[in-house]
C-alpha cells in the first residue's frame, strides 16, 4: 500500500506512491515531475 496526494509521510521512510515524493518541508506526498 502506498501514500497518495497530500497524505502525511515520513521523509526518512518515503512510502508515497509512484510519481510522488515525500516533501521534507511539508511532510506530505507531492507530485514529483
Curated annotation (Swiss-Prot):
<keyword id="KW-0872">Ion channel impairing toxin</keyword>
<dbReference type="GO" id="GO:0090729">
    <property type="term" value="F:toxin activity"/>
</dbReference>
<keyword id="KW-1015">Disulfide bond</keyword>
<keyword id="KW-0800">Toxin</keyword>
<dbReference type="GO" id="GO:0044493">
    <property type="term" value="P:envenomation resulting in negative regulation of voltage-gated sodium channel activity in another organism"/>
</dbReference>
<feature type="disulfide bond">
    <location>
        <begin position="9"/>
        <end position="22"/>
    </location>
</feature>
<keyword id="KW-0964">Secreted</keyword>
<comment type="function">
    <text>Inhibits several voltage-gated sodium channels and only one voltage-gated calcium channel (Cav2.2/CACNA1B (IC(50)=1.1 uM) and Nav1.2/SCN2A (IC(50)=3.7-80 nM), Nav1.3/SCN3A (IC(50)=88-5570 nM), Nav1.1/SCN1A (IC(50)=170-407 nM), Nav1.7/SCN9A (IC(50)=95.5-230 nM), Nav1.6/SCN6A (IC(50)=49.9-3990 nM), Nav1.4/SCN4A (IC(50)=113-400 nM or &gt;10 uM), Nav1.5/SCN5A (IC(50)=1524-1634 nM or &gt;10 uM)). The toxin acts by shifting the voltage dependence of channel activation to more depolarized potentials and by blocking the inward component of the sodium current.</text>
</comment>
<keyword id="KW-0108">Calcium channel impairing toxin</keyword>
<feature type="modified residue" description="Leucine amide">
    <location>
        <position position="33"/>
    </location>
</feature>
<comment type="similarity">
    <text>Belongs to the neurotoxin 10 (Hwtx-1) family. 04 (CcoTx1) subfamily.</text>
</comment>
<dbReference type="InterPro" id="IPR011696">
    <property type="entry name" value="Huwentoxin-1"/>
</dbReference>
<keyword id="KW-0960">Knottin</keyword>
<protein>
    <recommendedName>
        <fullName>Beta-theraphotoxin-Cm1b</fullName>
    </recommendedName>
</protein>
<keyword id="KW-0738">Voltage-gated sodium channel impairing toxin</keyword>
<dbReference type="InterPro" id="IPR013140">
    <property type="entry name" value="Huwentoxin_CS1"/>
</dbReference>
<dbReference type="GO" id="GO:0005246">
    <property type="term" value="F:calcium channel regulator activity"/>
</dbReference>
<dbReference type="GO" id="GO:0005615">
    <property type="term" value="C:extracellular space"/>
</dbReference>
<keyword id="KW-0027">Amidation</keyword>
<dbReference type="Pfam" id="PF07740">
    <property type="entry name" value="Toxin_12"/>
</dbReference>
<feature type="disulfide bond">
    <location>
        <begin position="16"/>
        <end position="29"/>
    </location>
</feature>
<keyword id="KW-1218">Voltage-gated calcium channel impairing toxin</keyword>
<feature type="disulfide bond">
    <location>
        <begin position="2"/>
        <end position="17"/>
    </location>
</feature>
<keyword id="KW-0528">Neurotoxin</keyword>
<dbReference type="GO" id="GO:0019871">
    <property type="term" value="F:sodium channel inhibitor activity"/>
</dbReference>
Amino acid at each position: 500500500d502506498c501514500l497518495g496526494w497530500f497524505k502525511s509521510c515520513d521523509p526518512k521512510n518515503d512510502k508515497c506512491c509512484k510519481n510522488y515524493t515525500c516533501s521534507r518541508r511539508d511532510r506530505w506526498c507531492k507530485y514529483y515531475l
